[in-house]
Amino acid sequence: MRSSAKQEELVKAFKALLKEEKFSSQGEIVQALQEEGFENINQSKVSRMLTKFGAVRTRNAKMEMVYCLPAELGVPTTSSPLKNLVLDIDYNDAVVVIHTSPGAAQLIARLLDSLGKAEGILGSIAGDDTIFTTPARGFTVKDLHDAILVLFEQEL
């Protein structure tokens, strides 16, 4: 098996184990991965993976401290299209509001601002996971909303 394919399998197994929310130590994760056939896994590798994928220790339903990967804290990978970071696009009479994955709003806002007035964007304000975008003169909020939907290939 190619090393990149083996790495993908390891990541898949690692994420699946953390979704079970029953591992309270890195040693338990190492043991579970070894039982799944990843003989060369060790504690330092698990530690790096926990950091890379943004794992946190939290209490599960049984009130045990366990490692988990909260979906809303998922770290985007280099192969993730930007559209996957956009969760919702809505508007009112004044602005278009875009909800993103945590930490992605400034990146998406910068992209929108780079399109500029010719595309109907006067400007954007971004927090951690929310963007307010206002239309340029000559464009309606609905026009801007529809253009952003097309840009991120969302359903109308």
Swiss-Prot record:
Cytoplasm is among the record's keywords: yes
Alphabetical keyword list: Amino-acid biosynthesis, Arginine biosynthesis, Cytoplasm, DNA-binding, Repressor, Transcription, Transcription regulation
Cellular localization per UniProt: Cytoplasm
Pathway: Amino-acid biosynthesis; L-arginine biosynthesis [regulation]
Biological processes annotated in GO: L-arginine biosynthetic process; protein complex oligomerization; regulation of arginine biosynthetic process
GO CC annotations on file: cytoplasm
GO MF: arginine binding; DNA binding; DNA-binding transcription factor activity
Chief localisation class: cytoplasm
Entry-linked NCBIfam families: argR_whole, PRK05066.1
Protein family membership: Belongs to the ArgR family.
Protein name in UniProt: Arginine repressor
Species of provenance: Klebsiella pneumoniae subsp. pneumoniae (strain ATCC 700721 / MGH 78578)
Annotated gene: argR
